[in-house]
Amino acid sequence: MEKVEELKKEIERLKKERNAIILAHNYQLPEVQDVADFVGDSLELARKATKVDADVIVFAGVDFMAETAKILNPDKIVLIPNKRATCAMANMLKVKHILEAKKKYPNAPVVLYVNSTAETKAYADVTVTSANAVDIIRKLDSDVIIFGPDKNLAHYVAKVTGKTIIPIPPEGHCYVHKKFTIEDVERAKKLHPNAKLMVHPECNPEVQEHADIIVSTGGMIRRACEWDEWVVFTEREMVYRLSKLYPNKKFYPAKEDAVCVGMKAITLQHVYESLRDMKYEVTVPEEIAEKARKAIERMLEMS
């Protein structure tokens, strides 16, 4: 405990010295969330990244999030505390998948989940997050949409909007959300009969069908006030975030082992060393950044 408190003090000192800000995703370890200047979902973090006046952004999240921050802040130093903080789903989508889909559906816009690499974002007409995917896709003047890389979010968007969504790659998924099953739903209802189920749209369709609400992590925070007990179908650390914001409500993880290894690759020690040694700096080639920036900025304009 003493070491944790000591690290927190050193991080605060270094933040002032470097004129740095720490942005953290909702899935980060509790102690990392505690030292962050801002904690949020992908959309909230992207918006925050456009309003940062610090010289240095330390991004406690996975690599595609840090890339997005760099794309939106080309003149700032963006650091990711651990290079192993990566997103398996983002890495499933390759440029070839986009080009193949465009051959089949030349008039369909390419909509990419922000959980994608900078390289693939350069081929997108617009990016989306789980918080704004439905609204943005509704606004697009096309009934056929090429969408990647999460097939479960694609399923949810298709169901809500009535549009034809072409998922690329066909089996793109988040391994954490894919873990949730009907058995987990049944167990949750048995263990917590008075609780409602909040489900992330990256979960499997059969789990979505039993949800009381299907929302992004930001949506979970906004709507948690509607009921006193919730079973949370997303990454485990979201329960910490919700419990901190709503101490008088009860939140239960649907699965204790719903853990994103990429998110957990960043510890308090990594954040401290990142600020101390100014590592690891995120770079995005300008020709990729310029194209990807248009897709991200269009998302922010349409949100």
From Swiss-Prot:
EC number(s) on file: 2.5.1.72
Cofactor names: [4Fe-4S] cluster
Pfam families xref list: NadA (PF02445)
InterPro entries, sorted: NadA (IPR003473), NadA_sf (IPR036094), Quinolinate_synth_type2 (IPR023066)
Record carries keyword Nucleus: no
Residues annotated for iminosuccinate binding in this entry: 25, 42, 113-115, 130, 200-202, 217
Sites where the protein binds [4Fe-4S] cluster: 87, 174, 260
Keywords: 4Fe-4S, Cytoplasm, Iron, Iron-sulfur, Metal-binding, Pyridine nucleotide biosynthesis, Transferase
Top-tier EC class: transferase
GO biological process: 'de novo' NAD biosynthetic process from L-aspartate
GO molecular function, one term: 4 iron, 4 sulfur cluster binding
Keyword hit for Metal-binding: yes
Top-level lineage group: Archaea
Cell compartment(s), UniProt: Cytoplasm
Cofactor binding mode and count: Binds 1 [4Fe-4S] cluster per subunit.
Swiss-Prot/TrEMBL catalytic activity: iminosuccinate + dihydroxyacetone phosphate = quinolinate + phosphate + 2 H2O + H(+)
GO cellular component, one term: cytoplasm
Principal cellular location given in the protein's record: cytoplasm
Subunit structure: Homodimer.
Known role: Catalyzes the condensation of iminoaspartate with dihydroxyacetone phosphate to form quinolinate.
Protein family (similarity comment): Belongs to the quinolinate synthase family. Type 2 subfamily.
Entry protein name: Quinolinate synthase
Lineage: Archaea, Methanobacteriati, Methanobacteriota, Thermococci, Thermococcales
Gene: nadA
